[in-house]
């Protein structure tokens, strides 16, 4: 097991399988498509230009560089987390307020919290591989990784 020190953005702890991408994610473009709408309410990346196309982020530890795109990003994450379809945790290289707004609101409004941590170094993708078992401890500022 490898333990990484990180910056806490939103505390809490979670664990799950890593879903890793080096591409920034536009959550609005990725999630606001017909297969993710009612009644099925899935959590699949539906941006056909993204390497995670057709992958389900629910319950995964999402590891990515940053978010891009719309101010709607927070609302997309709010919807996913409040419906229990969101990722288990977010590990991001460059955090921003658009990314965490929905996560904060899901905690305040629905008492559903997911940890968000920032790990800025580019060795992130060498240290956490897709499918790794990851524990994110936002309270301690640690990411614990067991790679396959």
What spans do the regions from the language model cover?
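Active-site/ligand-binding-proximal alpha/beta "capping" segment
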Residues: 148
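Feature captures the catalytic cores and cofactor-binding loops of soluble hydro-lyases/lyases
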Residues: 3-14, 19-144
């Amino acid at each position: 097991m490898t333990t990484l020190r990180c910056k806490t953005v939103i505390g809490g702890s979670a664990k799950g399988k890593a879903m890793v991408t080096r591409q920034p994610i536009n959550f609005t473009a990725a999630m606001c498509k017909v297969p993710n709408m009612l009644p099925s309410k899935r959590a699949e990346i539906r941006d056909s230009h993204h390497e995670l196309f057709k992958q389900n982020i629910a319950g995964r530890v999402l590891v990515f560089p940053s978010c891009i795109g719309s101010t709607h990003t927070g609302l997309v994450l709010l919807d996913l987390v409040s419906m229990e379809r969101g990722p288990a945790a977010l590990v991001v290289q460059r955090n921003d307020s658009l990314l965490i707004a929905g996560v904060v609101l899901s905690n305040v409004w629905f008492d559903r919290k997911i940890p968000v941590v920032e790990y800025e170094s580019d060795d992130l993708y060498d240290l956490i591989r897709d499918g790794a078992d990851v524990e994110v401890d936002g309270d301690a500022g640690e990411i614990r990784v067991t790679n396959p």
